[in-house]
């Protein structure tokens, strides 16, 4: 049986850790000069020893590479690779991760800030799980940031992943070619495939261990805006009314077909009966199957809907039922 675990907050000491487990940090950069030093400094201040810091730059045109080389000159753990041509953040992360030689791999963005005990807590928690991830803070400033606590059930991962910058992964898992799928965000692919390799998939630390800085130049935001320009106002009724058409449009995309066919193929075991059914419904163009998918999402809304506080009462049932349309509205995750 696959396992998902949530680790409760509790005090840890370095003496309790398995200190012989080695950790590599993998960071991908592109024109990140503004916030790069702050992130590198937070990695170097970790309470758990970092064995190597692999930074792969994707043809930056600012001073990013010069900053990286200055850190490498001062600290032998920092290894800088500069791509000959631009790969894009998905392929860049895949390429960089394959260069790690440690027991565990931690993924890092170029503009975040890590809490000093991030890696310490994750090494303690991961055990035999493929992935350990944590809550994170998100906002333009640390003081004004809010906590993000993504879902990691396989039902939730049918509709999107949790952030790569919160992940610590077993190297023997993350370096498998078959856990990296083309056409969707790499962290969504890793989260999904954690369920299809071994009995222990994902463990979750319910405490923010990094600050994900929101700013206009962050890579995921730019990717999303390249597909869907920012709306003039926050959507209210639009996902409920227009989401069905968006869902049908997404179904025609090759990346959609590959993803849900992959899930369908890997959920034939009876323990994945619910997810096998959901994948089949995601691929179907029959309007009646859409009703069944919506009903399943309503029934399992507390495991699927991103905000647990909004799953109660009549409106919670409506949100759960309409989740496939809400998910599809302005979705850019199949346009990589």
Residue map of PLM features:
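C-terminal subregions of glycosyltransferases and related glycan-biosynthesis enzymes
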Residues: 8, 184, 196, 200-202, ...
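Cell-envelope/extracellular polymer assembly enzymes that use nucleotide-activated donors
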Residues: 21-24, 52, 189, 193
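Short, well-formed alpha-helical segments that are part of the catalytic scaffolds
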Residues: 32-45
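A conserved acidic beta->alpha catalytic loop
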Residues: 57-66, 85
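Glycine-rich, basic loop-to-helix element that forms the pyrophosphate-binding segment
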Residues: 83-100
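Conserved nucleotide-sugar donor-binding catalytic segment
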Residues: 98, 153-229
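Short aromatic/hydrophobic "clamp" motif used to bind/position activated sugar donors
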Residues: 105
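Conserved donor NDP-sugar-binding/catalytic core segment of glycosyltransferases
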Residues: 117-145
